[in-house]
A protein has these predicted regions:
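Condensing-enzyme catalytic core mediating Claisen C-C bond formation in acyl metabolism
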Residues: 1-47, 148-204, 208, 294-297, ...
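Short glycine-rich or small-residue beta-strand-to-loop segments that form or flank ligand, phosphate
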Residues: 73-81, 107, 231-232
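Buried hydrophobic positions in well-ordered alpha/beta secondary-structure cores of metabolic enzymes
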Residues: 4-6, 61, 72-75, 93, ...
């Protein structure tokens, strides 16, 4: 059966605390942190973008699988912050890992679930024997306008999953999707920062799609919440995923491992990849996982996974928790500099 052969993650080593952002705008940092359940967020360095993060995560996945680029037949990168409007991220990743030229590659977009759409595509081409292994990547360096609510949570990071049929560490037993035309969040071509529907992003958008997709996935698998050891959903803030998990019937011990947003913010396309990576870092053979992605616009992808004996043979050092523990706090001035929020005027 097809599934995850290996995985890798990457989180930038800088972070800014919610209180620091709030102090710049004369807001109550404690209130913002409590309301969002986000206390700090990752910040990419000036030399980091979706490409560099994708390469780092992919190299870790390749290292764990003890593979080289010749084993990879497809690379698909999902993101809403690709550095180029016309120039694929995936071809650069392919070159960096030595996978060119005998492979297929493409960049995916579907807001925060672009990466899980890439997983589904890899499952398809691996399943019909077009390629032996494909890499699905979910990474973002998300944007939040200065002073906007998004600035408190929009962060950076992501992961890569090698999908194949040999030496699988977690089988993907079932996958399904729930998709509608729901304009909860958008950014037009040329706009630097996205716009959102405020409270409209909750009940009719995130919750409707995640809840329906979660129920559909469990119906397809013939499972119940108590059949799973772990659950991870998309994490636009620290409260929505907890509410969604509880509404679906899950308990804290099932969702707490994959819940990273309170410490690193919303990594958009990277959220499910990082949450799932944190789970795989500690999972045991036989553990069962439910993963539910969400992307604005809107849709959800659901996955039912079972961890195999193969995971015990994998080197799982360089964990997500290791990456979080090494993060260093920066101030708002440094954050603004790194994120290009400073208007330098006419440089001439």
């Amino acid at each position: 059966m097809s599934g995850i052969v290996s995985y890798g993650a990457y989180i930038p080593c800088h972070k800014i605390e919610t209180g620091e952002i709030a102090s710049v705008w004369g807001a109550d940092g404690s209130a913002w942190a409590k309301n969002l359940n986000v206390y700090s967020k990752s910040v990419p360095g000036p030399d980091e973008d979706v490409i560099t993060i994708s390469v780092e995560a992919t190299r870790l996945a390749m290292k764990r699988a003890k593979m080289d680029g010749t084993n990879i037949g497809a690379i698909y990168t999902g993101s809403e912050s690709h550095p180029y409007a016309v120039k694929p991220t995936s071809t650069i990743v392919a070159e960096a890992i030595g996978a060119t030229p005998n492979l297929t590659a493409a960049d995916f977009e579907f807001a925060c679930k672009a990466g899980t759409a890439a997983i589904q595509t890899c499952l398809g081409i691996v399943g019909n024997k077009q390629v032996e292994n494909g890499i699905a990547i979910g990474v973002d360096t998300s944007q939040g306008a200065p002073g906007d609510a998004l600035e408190y949570s929009a962060s950076a990071g992501g992961g890569a999953m090698i999908i194949g049929e040999k030496n699988v560490i977690a089988t993907i037993n079932h996958t399904t999707s729930y998709t509608t035309d729901t304009p909860d969040f958008w950014r037009r071509e040329g706009q630097k920062y996205p716009r959102h529907g405020g409270r409209f992003t909750g009940k009719p958008a995130f919750f409707k799609h995640v809840m329906m997709c979660g129920k559909m996935t469990m119906d397809m698998a013939g499972s119940k919440p108590e059949d799973y050891d772990y659950v991870v959903t998309h994490q636009p803030n620290g409260k929505f995923p907890i509410r969604a998990a509880k509404s679906l019937g899950f308990k804290e011990e099932q969702y707490k491992t994959g819940l990273l947003t309170p410490r690193i913010g919303n990594t958009y396309s990277g959220a499910i990849f990082l949450g799932l990576s944190a789970i795989l870092d500690i999972a045991k053979p036989g553990d069962r996982i439910l993963a539910i992605a969400y992307g604005s616009g809107a849709g959800s992808d659901g996955f039912d996974l079972t961890v195999t004996d193969q995971i015990a043979k994998m080197d799982r050092t360089e964990t997500v928790e290791d990456m979080i523990s090494r993060m260093e706090i920066i101030n708002y001035a440094t954050y603004a500099k790194y994120r290009g929020k400073l208007n330098m005027g006419d440089s001439k």
